[in-house]
Amino acid sequence: MKDLKDLVRPNVWNLKPYSSARDEFHGDASVFLDANENPWNMPYNRYPDPLQWKLKDRLAVLKGVDRSSIFLGNGSDEAIDLVIRAFCEPGLDSVVTISPSYGMYEVAANVNNVECRKVSLDENFDLDAEAVLESADEWTKVIFLCSPNNPSGNSLDRGSIYKILKNYEGIVVIDEAYIDFSAYPSFLKELSGFPNLIVLQTLSKAWGAAGIRLGMAFASPEIIGVLNKIKYPYNVNQLTQEKALELLNDEATMKHQVNEILTERNRLEKILSEPPFSYQVYPSDANFLLVNVAKADAMYNGLVKKGIVVRNRSNVQKCRGCLRITIGTPKENDSLLNAMKNMKL
C-alpha cells in the first residue's frame, strides 16, 4: 500500500474538521448549555453522540475489532460516498468496479466527478483479478468489490480478492452487505494484514433494519480517522443509535431469521430450477436469487398486476431475462410461486 498521505486528497489531509459541542466536552455533567439546544426534555432535545461510542462498543464485541476501526454512517451509501470524496480528486482520479454489481459505486463516483471504470465479470459472475488490476493505473485510488455480489448473489473468489489486495497499492473496498447469508467468512479478520482494506457491512439485510439507515465501515484507525474528518457532525441520529443498539443486543433473533431465510432460499432455488419452471437459478450466498425466466419483462409486469413486486434486472449487463427475487416469508414465497406457475406469457 502507498503511504496513506499519498492516497488521501491533499485538501482533505490538511483539513481541520468541524468540531461540535459534543466533540469538545469529555466527562460527566448535568447541565448542558453549550450546543444551543432546547432545554426541555422532549425527549430528543439533545444532539446525539457524534461518534456513536456505545454503538461502536457493542459492534466491537460482535465483530471482533477495536472500536477505533469502526465508522458508522447513514447507510453504507454514506461510507461509499465518503471514501470517494476522501481519496479521489474530482476530474483527475478514478475508481474501479465490477459489472454487474451494486449501482451506487458508479453513482457516487459520477456525483463526485470521478471516473468509474467497470470490469466485466464472466458468464458465471466470477471475478478476473488480472483484469481488475490491469484496469487500475496511477490515477486509480479505489477498487470496489461486492461479495456476495448484487445482483448475481454469488461470493467472489477469495483467491482473486487476495490477489487484488496483495498487488494493488490503493484502497480496496469489500462490500459485505449480504455476508450474514454466506457460507464464507467475512474479510474483517484480514484488516490487520491489509492496511488498504475497507470492509462495509449494514443492518439493512440480516438485521432487518433497513428503515433506520445504519451502515458500517471497518478499516485501520488511520482510514477511519479520515472518514470521521469529512463526515457531517451528527450523521447518525439518536433514534437510529438507540434502535440499532437494541437490535444488536438480540443477536439470537437475527440468527433465527437468517436460518429461516436460508431454508426458504434453498426451497425456492430447488423448485424454480425443476419442472414445471425449469429456470436457470444462479447460486446465491445472499438473501435473494437471480433467476433467468427468459421473458423477464412480461413476468415482471404480470407479477405486479397480482400485487407481487420483484426486481427486473433484464436491462443489466449479463442479466438479460433475469429477475432478482428477494426471499420472503414462506407465505410470500408460496404466493410468488403460485403466481409464476399460473402466469400465461
UniProtKB/Swiss-Prot annotation:
Sequence intervals crossing the membrane: none
Keyword rRNA-binding applies: no
Source species taxonomy: Bacteria, Pseudomonadati, Bacteroidota, Bacteroidia, Bacteroidales
Principal EC category: transferase
Assigned protein family: Belongs to the class-II pyridoxal-phosphate-dependent aminotransferase family. Histidinol-phosphate aminotransferase subfamily.
Listed GO MF terms: histidinol-phosphate transaminase activity; pyridoxal phosphate binding
UniProt cross-references to PANTHER family, sorted A to Z: HISTIDINOL-PHOSPHATE AMINOTRANSFERASE, HISTIDINOL-PHOSPHATE AMINOTRANSFERASE-RELATED
InterPro entries, per the entry: Aminotrans_II_pyridoxalP_BS, Aminotransferase_I/II_large, HisP_aminotrans, PyrdxlP-dep_Trfase, PyrdxlP-dep_Trfase_major, PyrdxlP-dep_Trfase_small
Alphabetically ordered keywords of this record: Amino-acid biosynthesis, Aminotransferase, Histidine biosynthesis, Pyridoxal phosphate, Transferase
Protein's GO biological process: L-histidine biosynthetic process
N6-(pyridoxal phosphate)lysine: residues bearing it: K205
Subunit and interaction comment: Homodimer.
Cofactor requirement: pyridoxal 5'-phosphate
Originating organism: Parabacteroides distasonis (strain ATCC 8503 / DSM 20701 / CIP 104284 / JCM 5825 / NCTC 11152)
Catalysed reactions, as listed in the record: L-histidinol phosphate + 2-oxoglutarate = 3-(imidazol-4-yl)-2-oxopropyl phosphate + L-glutamate
NCBIfam families to which the protein is assigned, alphabetical: hisC
Keyword Protein transport part of the UniProt annotation: no
Functional pathway: Amino-acid biosynthesis; L-histidine biosynthesis; L-histidine from 5-phospho-alpha-D-ribose 1-diphosphate: step 7/9
Protein name: Histidinol-phosphate aminotransferase
Protein EC: 2.6.1.9
Pfam families in UniProt: Aminotran_1_2
